[in-house]
Amino acid sequence: MPGDQVILLSLMALGVVARNALIVTAAGVVLILRVLALERFFPLLERRGLEAGLIFLLIAVLVPFATGEVGWAEIRQSFTSWTGLAAILGGIIAAVLSGYGVTLLQVKPEVIVGMVVGTILGVVLFKGIPVGPLAAAGFTAILLALVRGH
């Protein structure tokens, strides 16, 4: 069995042990594509997979606006409460960190391997959620800056 398939099966096993359906499903889909010799879809998934995932995430977040569960009162409150202001600041920080992440990935694309391993360990061992390579790269960029002292 080729090494890439062993890695994907190992990831699936880790996901099963950790009871994480996301890792099991993702590794399983990639493994099936590989076994069925459908690698031609890999570049598309690499280029557009994150974008598609973010679109679905945003759709899920926007549904409460469409259902009326969140309206103008809640929007106004986000600008006038400590919780709302903290959420706005959190969003700004996340966007800035993701910007640092893009820069890091452009300058040192090899960090993606460590980030993937770290993300898997975080999901499997600490019940984390894979937030995506831009956020992980942003945190990595900050950690590198702290270690290097600039």
UniProtKB/Swiss-Prot annotation:
Q: Where in the cell is it found?
A: Cell membrane
Mark the transmembrane ranges: 13-33, 52-72, 85-105, 111-131
Cellular component aspect of the GO annotation: plasma membrane
Q: Which domain of life is it from?
A: Bacteria
Any Pfam family matching the protein: DUF441
Give the record's membrane topology. Answer: Multi-pass membrane protein
This protein's major location comes to membrane
- Provide the alphabetized UniProt keywords: Cell membrane, Membrane, Transmembrane, Transmembrane helix
The question of whether Cell inner membrane is a record keyword is answered with no
The family annotation for this protein states:
Belongs to the UPF0756 family.
**Would you tell me the protein name for this molecule?**
UPF0756 membrane protein STH2648
Recorded source organism is Symbiobacterium thermophilum (strain DSM 24528 / JCM 14929 / IAM 14863 / T)
